[in-house]
Design a protein with these regions (language model features):
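N-terminal export signals
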Residues: 3, 9-28
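Short, glycine-/small- and polar/acidic-enriched structural segments
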Residues: 30-157, 164-167, 183-189, 206-210
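Short, solvent-exposed loop/beta-turn-alpha elements that line the ligand-binding surface or hinge
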Residues: 57-59, 215-223, 291-299
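Well-formed, non-transmembrane alpha-helical positions, independent of function
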Residues: 76-77, 95, 129, 175-176, ...
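Sec/Tat-exported extracytoplasmic proteins
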Residues: 82, 87, 97-100, 139, ...
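Pocket-lining segment of extracytoplasmic ligand-binding domains
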Residues: 91-92, 171-269
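Secondary-structure end/capping motifs
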Residues: 237-312
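Conserved C-terminal helix/tail region of periplasmic/extracytoplasmic solute-binding proteins
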Residues: 303-328
Length: 328
């Protein structure tokens, strides 16, 4: 059965918060205890740390953090109310809001996870260095593609000047890069840290060639791509919900300060929750552009990001920009 555009973009968007390994889904939370669901990736680091260290205990007694690996599970849970906190791509949250699911964006937890990686020997230092080369981009006609097209336009690079090779998944680009079928690849953190680490034992050392967030500044006048955050649903309505979100974001901000002060210690604390090696969690902190922004405070940056997407395919946001009710 063919996926609807809405569901397709939600599934792809959710997959862009990468799952580097396959994890068993743990869909049953302890009864009546609040749960924050997130991917085993950068945007979840802050939430997982806040839960693990008890920083949310006064606000959300008994709160748990659980990894999701099935976007359909999150979509259905938000719709039914059985899930009321989930870390998702910001545009996936907007899509659900526009479809009437009653969700809001509480915050932004990363200002961008996108990088271009390449063999060190290729000496790619600027976007212009990719002209005439093959660049792997995941998911044609979806977020990474739209971001790259907007950047190429901003830098006056003609669409065919770089030979874009589309892949159907994030991992697919890595073997292509290692065997020389492509010269560089668009990838997200922490997958970038993972492939760089793995390549140290290979004759072909992979490096982080370009930070796409810095290239984005030519498009939006800011180097922040508000890519993902916490989407909240049932239990966060009205003035009481606003107060709860404000308090939650304050806890997250305190958690982020502690994480940045000692990434290795934080990684040791949460590796069990994320089911990810501590050294890779610690390495990814420096490159995940972790932030805690109230969604309403970064609405202009979100709308700039959303407009780039919607101008190329309105279905990715459910047909329109979300109204003010989306931004908590």
């Amino acid at each position: 059965m063919m996926l609807t555009q809405t569901r397709r973009h939600f599934l792809i968007g959710a997959s862009l918060l990468p799952i580097v390994c396959a994890f068993p889904a743990n869909v049953v939370a302890e009864e009546n205890k609040p749960v924050i669901w997130g991917p085993p990736a950068g945007p979840s680091i802050v939430a997982a740390y806040a839960v693990k260290t008890g920083m949310l205990e006064d606000l959300l007694p008994g709160c748990q953090f659980k990894v999701w690996n099935n976007p359909d599970q999150i979509r259905a849970g938000l719709s039914s109310g059985s899930i009321n906190m989930a870390i998702l791509p910001s545009y996936s949250g907007a899509n659900l809001y526009n479809k009437g699911l009653g969700v809001r964006l509480a915050n932004i937890l990363t200002d961008g996870l996108l990088y271009i990686v390449a063999p060190q020997a290729s000496n790619i230092k600027t976007l212009q260095d990719l002209v005439g080369k093959k660049l792997a981009v995941p998911f044609k006609n979806d977020m990474p593609d739209y971001i790259m097209q907007a950047i190429l336009k901003a830098y006056d690079i003609k669409p065919n000047a770089i030979d874009i090779q589309y892949t159907g998944s994030l991992p697919e680009a890595m073997p292509l890069l290692m065997i020389g079928r492509v010269d560089a690849a668009v990838i997200v953190e922490p997958a970038a840290s993972t492939v760089i680490s793995m390549s140290t034992a290979s004759p072909k050392k992979i490096v982080r060639a370009l930070d796409i967030q810095k290239l984005w500044e030519k498009v939006s006048k800011t180097d922040a791509i508000p890519q993902a955050g916490l989407v909240v649903g049932k239990g966060f309505e009205g003035d009481e919900g606003k107060d709860k979100i404000k308090a939650l974001n304050a806890c997250f901000s305190d958690a982020l300060e502690k994480i940045k002060a000692d990434p290795e210690k934080a990684a040791d604390e949460i590796s069990g929750l994320l089911d990810f090696p501590p050294r890779l969690i610690a390495a990814s902190v420096a490159f995940s552009h972790l932030v805690v922004h109230n969604a309403s405070e970064v609405k202009p940056a979100l709308e700039t990001f959303f407009n780039v997407l919607i101008e190329q395919n309105s279905a990715i946001l459910g047909g329109k920009l979300p109204d003010d009710g989306f931004y908590a």
